């Protein structure tokens, strides 16, 4: 059976994916699925750098502005929603283009990672949750380190939910969750895909990040977060943990001055971009697109991307 086509356009935050994604979609007859853990939420426009209606230029977008901030958005939900969108796009005779910077989300689609076969048992889970309550998160994390050191390395002790999940998985299946995840990643892709990573010189990227945050503040980021707060959204919600939201919330709650909040936001966004790039470097089969090699000209970048897509038989010459 012929593999269905899939295009990925990713890269670190503030690198300039949005504009290029529209040009790409128009050139190949594509529709865009957002692979972004924040743009999926309603009322969170400025801090998530959400694409505006007029920027979409008629290109259909999925997974943008669809969830209430009180709803949890996680990898399994993303995968479900994205696959549903892909079916619609294929039915339209178009090519799905995954656009966004959340590497794990992209991998879940490209590799079609199976999260559902992870058995669940509320009794076992409750036992470990109780253990954490009585002995603390660090003691729980030590239990994980004993049976699955690899998972313990990648899951922080503070993420009790994931630590419990890993312990539960081991108890039920007799298998380490890290091994299960490695097996899933080693699978081939069910798609004929091209995976583009847009990148730039680090110092220029950092400059863009700083500038973008200054612009967000000018556009009314503080007011946006205040509005969310007024609607009853609190900092323990997944949505409010996003970059730009948790820092401004800390300012509004009187824990930081605005200057401190902005300093932390800029610093943490730079760190985030660095982590994104580390993730993409570990991914096999990616096509790096360094903007400076094309004189920062989107037309030249697009032409190079189209060459790759023709080579892979995703689009015809």
Predicted feature locations:
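Phosphate/pyrophosphate-binding catalytic cores of soluble transferases and nucleic-acid-acting enzymes
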Residues: 1-317
């Amino acid at each position: 059976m012929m593999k269905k086509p899939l295009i990925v356009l990713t890269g670190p935050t503030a690198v300039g994916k949005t504009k290029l994604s529209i040009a790409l979609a128009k050139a190949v007859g594509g529709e865009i699925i957002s692979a972004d853990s924040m743009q999926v939420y309603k009322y969170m426009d400025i801090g998530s750098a959400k694409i505006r209606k007029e920027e979409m230029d008629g290109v259909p977008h999925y997974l943008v502005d669809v969830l209430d901030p009180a709803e949890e958005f996680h990898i399994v939900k993303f995968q479900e929603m994205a696959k549903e969108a892909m079916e619609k796009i294929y039915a339209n005779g178009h090519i799905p283009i995954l656009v966004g910077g959340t590497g794990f989300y992209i991998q879940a689609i490209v590799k079609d990672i199976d999260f559902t076969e992870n058995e669940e048992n509320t009794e076992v889970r409750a036992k470990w949750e109780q253990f954490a309550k009585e002995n603390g998160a660090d003691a729980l994390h030590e239990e994980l380190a004993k049976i699955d050191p690899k998972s313990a390395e990648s899951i922080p002790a503070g993420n009790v939910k994931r630590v419990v999940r890993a312990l539960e998985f081991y108890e039920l299946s007799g298998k380490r969750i890290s091994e299960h995840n490695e097996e899933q990643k080693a699978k081939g892709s069910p798609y004929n895909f091209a995976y583009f990573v847009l990148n730039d010189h680090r110092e220029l990227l950092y400059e863009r990040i700083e500038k973008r945050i200054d612009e967000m503040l000018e556009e009314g980021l503080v007011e946006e977060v205040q509005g969310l707060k007024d609607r009853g959204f609190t900092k323990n919600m997944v949505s409010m943990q996003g970059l730009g939201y948790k820092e401004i919330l800390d300012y509004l709650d009187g824990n930081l001055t605005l200057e401190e909040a902005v300093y932390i936001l800029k610093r943490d966004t730079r760190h985030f971009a660095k982590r994104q790039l580390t993730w993409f470097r570990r991914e096999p089969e990616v096509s790096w697109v360094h903007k400076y090699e094309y004189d920062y000209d989107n037309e030249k970048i697009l032409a190079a991307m189209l060459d790759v897509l023709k080579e892979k038989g995703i689009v015809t010459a």
